[in-house]
Amino acid sequence: MGIVIGIDVGGSTTKIVGVEDKKIKNPMFVKATDPVTSLFGAFGKYIYDNNISLSNIEKVILTGVGSAYIDQPLYGLPTAKTDEFLANGLGAQYNTGLDSLLVVSMGTGTSFVKVQGSTIEHIGGLGIGGGTILGLSKLLLKTHDFHQIASLAEHGSLNDIDLHIRDITPHPLPGLPLDVTASIFGKADAN
């Protein structure tokens, strides 16, 4: 048996991992401006960094929205596609060892996948995720560089920007302590 390469070609980031003998090998994240460049860049970097030859790869499995742009085998290797929600559910089940769980996958957006035994079902999602952070940061901070955004966030305080229960009442509400957020960015006009 060779190495199975799994690649999630997302809306903003491509994730790649190898699996050999049921063991996960060195997950990697790669960003690029388009899905095809991101996919081939991630694949090349992954096999180079991990000293994997094409002859040692048993199969490549693609998922994610960007996989729709790929309609031929990668480098002549057996290549298949799988549903992203199924992959998220099976991956979470494998990593946790749990039979029933709710998987929250935050990528460009956020999806919710219900797992009960062998039944895996996408039950909804939000248009809020990493893409929201990058878009807001571009508009407000004039940058979409994730490392710069993270550095700025480390030096900020949510108490300066988010409205908390304590900001609107001196008494806790049933089930809501004073330090719970009442409104994200609720103090933005005051700062």
Predicted segments, located by residue:
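Conserved phosphate-binding catalytic cores of ATP/NTP-utilizing and phosphoryl-transfer enzymes
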Residues: I70-V104, T108-T119
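Short glycine-rich, Thr/Ser-proximal phosphate-binding strand/loop in the N-terminal lobe
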Residues: I3-G41, K45, I120
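Flexible, glycine/proline-enriched loop segments at strand-loop-helix junctions
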Residues: V30, P78, T119-L126, L134-L139
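A short acidic Gly-Thr/Ser loop motif
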Residues: D8-T13, V65, V104-G109, G127-G130
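Active-site rim beta-loop-alpha module in soluble metabolic enzymes
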Residues: K138-N191
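Short glycine-aspartate micro-motif
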Residues: G2-D8, I57-I61, L101-S105, G125
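Phosphate/pyrophosphate-binding loops at sites that engage ATP/ADP/AMP, CoA/4′-phosphopantetheine
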Residues: F43-E58, N191
